[in-house]
């Protein structure tokens, strides 16, 4: 399978270094190997998604292995849930591909797609991980045919439930990872006067049945520069005063707790 046209939703066919639909809408592949399927009219800003600075901080932090237990847990679920008839999986909001390439390596017989709205992140991902098929696209308008995916992975990424239901095959899976109540409490303690437990959103995915929920919690011991990179990755970075950044950078060791919720949803038959 391949992509569908983001303009007319018909299948895209690969012709040399381009994807072309029956209406002759054409999308050229970049030299790094990805394709941009985000039409200008679907952009909310000139350069949507993470900046180069945010992407580089996330890559440095993830490459150090601090979130590898989360990655390993999702890989284990994919191996357990997908049978030998599976053909395609999609990582939504894949960023620079840290999780995505592990899915591809664990499932070599399956085509692994990575999607993100950030061109900067996808360019870096495609250059580093040629075993994955990457695209720049909106998670709210997935450029894939109906019932084309055996599994979709969403790690912190938004996506309309109706799009998930449209793209996932009957009996297929959506795996989500979201922050649990105590996720990064120590980091929040440097920023906020009062730190409250994160209230997990009780998500409902129409057309899916929640088959399993699991918690993954473990401590991290970070260097100062790693703690700074972690803060840059978070949605509360913009609330951090200059002295918070300076305090973190000066630390030899910063201990912090992770708390992830992993949910497995199965598409109704």
UniProtKB/Swiss-Prot annotation:
It holds the Pfam family Zn_ribbon_RlmA. Gene3D superfamilies: Vaccinia Virus protein VP39. One of its GO terms (biological process) is rRNA base methylation. It catalyses: guanosine(745) in 23S rRNA + S-adenosyl-L-methionine = N(1)-methylguanosine(745) in 23S rRNA + S-adenosyl-L-homocysteine + H(+). Its EC number is 2.1.1.187. Transmembrane segments: none annotated. S-adenosyl-L-methionine binds at residues 67, 96-97, 183. Keywords: Metal-binding, Methyltransferase, rRNA processing, S-adenosyl-L-methionine, Transferase, Zinc. Zn(2+) binds at residues 5, 8, 21, 25. GO terms for molecular function: 23S rRNA (guanine(745)-N(1))-methyltransferase activity; methyltransferase activity; rRNA (guanine-N1-)-methyltransferase activity; zinc ion binding. Specifically methylates the guanosine in position 745 of 23S rRNA. Homodimer. Belongs to the methyltransferase superfamily. RlmA family. This is 23S rRNA (guanine(745)-N(1))-methyltransferase.
